[in-house]
Amino acid sequence: GKLFVMHDHSFYRTTGLREFSWNLTFDEIEQLDAGSFFSDAYAGEKIPGLEEVIQLAKENHVRLNIEIKPSANDKDIEKSVVDLVREMDFADSCVISSQMYGSLQKVKDYDPEISTLYVMSLAYGNINRLKAADGFSMEAGNATPSMVSRIHNAGKQIYVWTVNNRKTINRMIDLNVDNIITDRVALVQECIYDSKTNDVIRQYVKFLREL
């Protein structure tokens, strides 16, 4: 089968078709309209294949967070993803994430060098034992200073989602999270720039005071 990019297991929410992904061929999937759900301006947009998305990311120097959502109907989807990432020489430009820790273990078995993220509500317990996870991805509201410190002290990273307002973006920057998942990329970039500029100003003021 061919890997494609879709958030849900069912096509209904975004295409109106009451069908599960594993019941259609990719040729049939390509005929669906996945754009009208968002806006008439996107009517006719197709569900993309993962290969197509990776190629677009490479051409535009964009890193990807590839989330694997396995089901009982998938046959070793982890190997298929790893093989495609390797084939397209994209391993250093992506992170593979999943809510299923077993999927991350399989990814690491196939390629220990690929970065992985465990998608979870909270990073609790002994996170050091989760060897197959290079980091954790969680809802931003669950991120706390102590949690960020525990994750960083374990040598792992923390990604937060989905952060779309300035106040929460700035709070995540102050928490020193490693990655902010957002629908408003330009706003996040602006906040990061402002934060760094403010740091420079603070350091300069401190320098002047110490003269």
Can you name each region flagged by the protein language model?
Residues 67, 96-98, 162, 181-182:
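Active-site-adjacent beta-strand anchor residues
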Residues 74-87, 102-116, 128-130:
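Distinct, well-ordered alpha-helical segments
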Residues 40-44, 117-211:
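C-terminal active-site rim and adjoining tail of enzyme catalytic domains
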Residues 58-64, 90-94, 112-115, 132-134, ...:
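Short, well-ordered coil/turn segments that N-cap beta-strands
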Residues 29, 53, 66, 100, ...:
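Conserved, mostly hydrophobic/aromatic
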Residues 38, 62-73, 134:
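Glycine-rich phosphate-binding "P-loop"
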Residues 50-54, 78-82, 101-105, 144-148, ...:
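Generic structural signal for well-ordered alpha-helices
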